[in-house]
UniProtKB/Swiss-Prot annotation:
Source species: Influenza A virus (strain A/Silky Chicken/Hong Kong/SF189/2001 H5N1 genotype A)
TM spans (from-to): 23-43
Keyword annotations of the record: Disulfide bond, Host cell membrane, Host membrane, Host-virus interaction, Hydrogen ion transport, Inhibition of host autophagy by virus, Ion channel, Ion transport, Lipoprotein, Membrane, Palmitate, Phosphoprotein, Signal-anchor, Transmembrane, Transmembrane helix, Transport, Viral ion channel, Virion
Lineage: Viruses, Riboviria, Orthornavirae, Negarnaviricota, Polyploviricotina
Subcellular localization: Virion membrane; Host apical cell membrane
Classification via InterPro entries: Flu_M2
Protein family membership: Belongs to the influenza viruses matrix protein M2 family.
Gene field: M
A Pfam family it matches: Flu_M2
Function description: Forms a proton-selective ion channel that is necessary for the efficient release of the viral genome during virus entry. After attaching to the cell surface, the virion enters the cell by endocytosis. Acidification of the endosome triggers M2 ion channel activity.
Membrane protein topology class: Single-pass type III membrane protein
Activity regulation statement: The M2 protein from most influenza A strains is inhibited by amantadine and rimantadine, resulting in viral uncoating incapacity. Emergence of amantadine-resistant variants is usually rapid.
The protein's assembly and partners: Homotetramer; composed of two disulfide-linked dimers held together by non-covalent interactions. May interact with matrix protein 1.
UniProt-listed Gene3D superfamilies: 6.10.250.1640
This protein's name: Matrix protein 2
Any one cellular-component term (Gene Ontology): host cell plasma membrane
Amino acid sequence: MSLLTEVETPTRNEWECKCSDSSDPLVVAASIIGILHLILWILDRLFFKCIYRRLKYGLKRGPSTEGVPESMREEYRQEQQSAVDVDDGHFVNIELE
């Protein structure tokens, strides 16, 4: 007797999906949420540098200058730069003994 005759092969019915209530609204909603979660996770991993850099630094740019005349923009830049510039005479040299 051959060994091949003793081996059982799976029938087609065993490989089919056994979920009879896959049209249940809860199952459909869970599937949609799962797919959306996967898509968002992939996008997050692909663009995380852009997204988090925009959130971290994009909100700290200061007031928008859209619609402001160029002369006022230049004046604002000069005020900001003068606030940053420091005269060397203001520093105090402290020597520790």
